[in-house]
A protein has these predicted regions:
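Non-heme di-metal
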Residues: 1-324
Length: 324
């Protein structure tokens, strides 16, 4: 089969000294300043507390992280790439390339957790489960449909709902364990992921709002109706996914409140009003406390915890330097 390839006749080099939208540089600096890798987080310190979880709790944790891996895989391989097609400037495209890479880092992070804490058969079972779970596959299909739609604004709506809403049924569990002094180093890494996703959702939501500015009132209302309808469709599925995961440990209602809270956050990123009333968004205070970037950090030599780290600088020494 012959595939016609349009020749590239004109390419514009990205010039960071001439910024068309200052938000691009602001977010670029934030994302690069936040750069991290899972290999720097001491996950092995969580092996003792992992052993205190029941078999059912371990299975739940592995499945939750596998579900998150699937969403990160979509964002890395499809979502960010589709958004780059609509980038208004080379700087926006560069920021989205960073977003894509960090989604790959996030997916890699869950594999680091698995290889450190879990047995290979248990992990393989979870990956099979992710391919067969109807609710996980359904939300993936809904998001993928919008990424393939060709509508730049609808793609951004889908991306913000994934980044700022769908991830959080999974993020709840490591925060829950952390609030009980379990898997604290794993929670530190999840907080690094949450920090990234917060910037991603904010930035893509900002670009969405900039796109809306160029539309007439009728088209704006059409997009708003679409956003709320898509959120409700995803929420209905996410509630069922949450029930299937968390009913066995009695956490379903708490997780749903967390979902309501973050659904409203996603709408805020899009510039819309909240959908769920305050009463439905009363998240367990222990979970909100665990979400804080400094929740478990004491940076002592015994804990090893910390949701940030510093890459050390090597300094050359000689034997005489060690004569005290």
């Amino acid at each position: 089969m012959n595939i016609a390839v349009k020749p590239v006749t004109h390419v514009r080099a990205v010039n960071w000294n001439r910024i068309e939208d200052e938000k691009d540089l602001e977010v670029w600096n934030r994302l690069t300043g936040n750069f991290w890798l899972p290999e720097k987080v001491p996950l092995s310190n969580d092996i003792p507390s992992w052993a205190t979880l029941t078999a059912a709790e371990q299975q739940l944790t592995i499945r939750v992280f596998t579900g998150l891996t699937l969403l990160d895989t979509i964002q890395n391989g499809v979502g960010s790439i589709r958004l780059m097609e609509d980038a208004a400037t080379p700087h926006e495209e560069a920021v989205l390339s960073n977003v894509s890479f960090m989604e790959a880092v996030h997916a890699r992070s869950y594999s680091s957790i698995f290889s450190t804490l879990c047995s290979t058969p248990d992990v393989d079972d979870a990956y099979r489960w992710s391919e067969e779970n109807e609710f996980l596959q359904r939300k993936s299909a809904v998001i993928m449909e919008q990424y393939r739609s060709g509508d730049p604004l609808k793609k951004k709506v889908a991306s913000v709902l994934l980044e700022s809403f769908l991830f959080y049924s999974g993020f709840y569990l490591p925060m829950y364990w952390s609030s009980r002094a379990k898997l604290t180093n794993t929670a530190d890494m999840i907080r690094l992921i949450i920090r990234d996703e917060a910037v991603h959702g904010y930035y893509i939501g900002y670009k969405f709002q900039r796109g809306l500015e160029r539309l007439g009132d009728e088209r704006k209302q059409e997009i708003k109706d679409f956003a709320f309808e898509l959120l409700l469709e995803l929420y209905d599925n996410e509630a069922k996914y949450t029930e299937a995961l968390y009913d066995g440990v009695g956490l379903t209602e708490d997780v749903k409140k967390f979902l309501h809270y973050n659904a409203n956050k996603a709408l805020m990123n899009l510039g819309y009003e909240a959908l769920f009333p305050g009463e439905a968004c009363k998240v367990n205070p222990a979970i909100l406390s665990a979400l804080s970037p400094n929740a478990d950090e004491n940076h002592d030599f015994f804990s090893g915890s910390g949701s940030s780290y510093v890459i050390g600088k090597a300094v050359a020494t000689e034997d005489d330097d060690w004569d005290f």
